[in-house]
Amino acid sequence: MTGKPAYKRVLLKASGEALMGSQGFGIDVSVADRIANDIKQARALGVEVGVVIGGGNIFRGVAVASKGGDRVTGDHMGMLATVINSLALRTSLHKIGVDSVVLSAIAMPEICESFSQRQATAYMDEGKVVIFAGGTGNPFFTTDSAAALRAAEIEADALLKGTQVDGIYSADPKKDPGATRFDQLTHKEFLDRGLAVMDTAAVALARENNIPIIVYSIHENGGLADILQGKGRCTIVSDN
């Protein structure tokens, strides 16, 4: 890997579902290990990496609300699921010698450190991979919004969203064979089209802070390093 990376510091958003692999629930350790290896390759390029992982492989707060339950409690349960996933990724990173730390938006000092912007940037300056757990710490906000928020706080050069497909499509390509993939969109075009790959609050926050969003397939081995070097299939959401 000799290509010069296009970004110095990035925030990687991975869905909880990505950690399931072919399982119907929970964490496939082999998938966590592969994502960790992708992050190691990014670090080898000299790129500083922050990570936000969703919790949908374990629990979704909206599922509680849809069945008449309390959305706030459901979202708190979902935040705890992101902590579990974050600890799993940290374990996978440590196995391959990548120094990493979990910072949680919800205080749980016996398990991981609490989030602060200053500490997060200090760790990244030291070369550590920082995994942000607990979402934003508030209900009614998705982990997409948490990713955009943390990207702004650490002054990331880009927000990378690893998904099930290789970019943003006009429709779900798994359901519509005629769906077309976009190479590039502006933040406004994304919002105007009502595309569902990332929630509007996250995209609006990225736009306000001039953070490009890059959507790519998280299932490609070495895909993260390729994207960082300007290679690979993806969609770039940027106003520049």
UniProtKB/Swiss-Prot annotation:
GO terms for molecular function: ATP binding; UMP kinase activity. GO terms for cellular component: cytosol. UMP binds at G55, D75, T136, G137, N138, P139, F140, F141, T142, T143. Allosterically activated by GTP. Inhibited by UTP. It is found in: Cytoplasm. Residues 21-26 are annotated as: Involved in allosteric activation by GTP. Its EC number is 2.7.4.22. ATP binds at K13, A14, S15, G16, G56, R60, T163, Q164, Y169, D172. Keywords: Allosteric enzyme, ATP-binding, Cytoplasm, Kinase, Nucleotide-binding, Pyrimidine biosynthesis, Transferase. Disulfide bonds: none annotated. The keyword Metal-binding does not apply. SUPFAM superfamilies: Carbamate kinase-like (SSF53633). Pfam families: AA_kinase. Catalyzes the reversible phosphorylation of UMP to UDP. Belongs to the UMP kinase family. Homohexamer. HAMAP family: PyrH_B. This is Uridylate kinase. It comes from Brucella suis biovar 1 (strain 1330).
